[in-house]
């Protein structure tokens, strides 16, 4: 004798849902509200911090007479200009998203953020390392730090490294959200 299951469904009565008295509970935090993600207040703060450090490094380098005679310093200036433009554009986009209450959690937009952050982060790191290397060469190996503004070079390299750290944080946050978005 063969046993067969029957397709009949037996409904079960459920108790009515619990009705809480008082104000409704706040919505649960979702991944698209993650601090630091594009379109959030923390994401905007990260962009302006990137812009601030990059602009500081750029202003320090430009204020030094004769910085353009060293290729590494010219590369740092070019990288900081690119970082400033990138951070300013994405900061404006974050402001727009915050003001209009729109989400930037689109995989195409997040891919754009990830690739742009990766490129600018790499350029910023390369420029900061090159400037720091030349500064160490001038200071420690050639012992010609007096007439060559080593303190300013060191400050510009330090600001570039800070901009790199914040851009890298932004890159990893955007990449993580892009991966979990799909």
UniProtKB/Swiss-Prot annotation:
Pfam families: CASP_dom (PF04535). It is found in: Cell membrane. The chain crosses the membrane at residues 48-68, 73-93, 118-138, 159-179. The keyword Mitochondrion does not apply. It is a multi-pass membrane protein. InterPro entries: CASP_dom, CASPL-5. Keywords: Cell membrane, Membrane, Transmembrane, Transmembrane helix. Residues 1-47, 94-117, 180-182 are cytoplasmic. Residues 69-72, 139-158 are extracellular. GO terms for cellular component: membrane; plasma membrane. The keyword RNA-binding does not apply. Homodimer and heterodimers. Belongs to the Casparian strip membrane proteins (CASP) family. This is CASP-like protein 5A1.
